Amino acid sequence: MRVFFFGGKGGVGKTTASSAFAVKLSEQGKKVLLLSTDPAHSLSDVFNTELQGETKLSENLTVKEIDLNEELKEYRSRVFKLAEATLRKETLRELEGIIHSLEESPGIEDVVIFEALSKEVVYRENEYDYIVVDTAPTGHTLGLLKTVRNLGNFLEEIVKLKEKVYELKKLSGKSVHEEALEYLKERKERFKKFSEIIYDKSYFFAVLTPEKLPFEETKRLVNSLKHYGIRVKALIINKVLPENPQDEFLKARKEVEKKFLKEIENYFMDIEKISIPYQKEEVVGYEKLKEFSKFLPLG
């Protein structure tokens, strides 16, 4: 099993590219799970289908949009369940206020998405040949990478917490809450396995358009991916204009585009580049995605 991540600036077509890639793999007879961590839930739009939870779109393709709100509720419930096994009621009330504050703090989305994505990838590794992940815009993707990178410290804290649970229960004379301890153990092993998959079985497609802002954001993204040791499979340069447009406006746009195509080529010399022409029509629906997928490589 391999995992392919698609990321980039909002509006460059990463959801279209990731969906078309998943369709292409599934049409080759591979079992594919397409996941979206983007709160915008764009998969429903691109497939022109109302996705309810997990949806099987063909014999080989399953699609799921991770619901951040639902995952946050489950995450909160788990934390309280663990806390109930170790803390007094007065402390629990204080903890409840702290958790509600944390839900609105920066970075909580990255933690919750990491939790949800780790379950999908680790638990279902043997069900699929490929898992394709349509990520949220670049900032969220980098937050996820930082979470993976800091995994060692996080796991160490979990182990310490487990030891404290034992000590608290011994002091109070109560029996250890097995469910809480099992949850800590499961989480530790799952995060470790997810980290291994990210570094050993994952590849990243960076999607951009030949313009200044997407180019600059892609530079930051690719440099961060290299810093974290994640392999960049290719750059997908989307919405490339025809070579010799007749319209004066398009001619001017083409000159700007040529400049950034050259900059992309020079800056990312060691990375494969895939150029996709600007499409005449919106790429919406399974058949359109299948047609669009001819521009993309196989896994």
Curated annotation (Swiss-Prot):
Pfam families according to UniProt: ArsA_ATPase
Reactions catalysed: arsenite(in) + ATP + H2O = arsenite(out) + ADP + phosphate + H(+)
Positions bound to ATP: 8-15
InterPro entries per the UniProt record, alphabetical: Anion-transp_ATPase-like_dom (IPR025723), ATPase_ArsA/GET3 (IPR016300), P-loop_NTPase (IPR027417)
Keywords: Arsenical resistance, ATP-binding, Nucleotide-binding, Translocase
GO molecular function list: ATP binding; ATP hydrolysis activity; ATPase-coupled arsenite transmembrane transporter activity
Keyword Nucleotide-binding: yes
EC number(s) recorded for this UniProt protein: 7.3.2.7
SUPFAM superfamilies: P-loop containing nucleoside triphosphate hydrolases
Claim: Zinc is one of the keywords in the record: no
Entry's family note: Belongs to the arsA ATPase family.
Function description: Anion-transporting ATPase. Catalyzes the extrusion of arsenite.
Name of the protein in question: Putative arsenical pump-driving ATPase 2
Gene that encodes the chain: arsA2
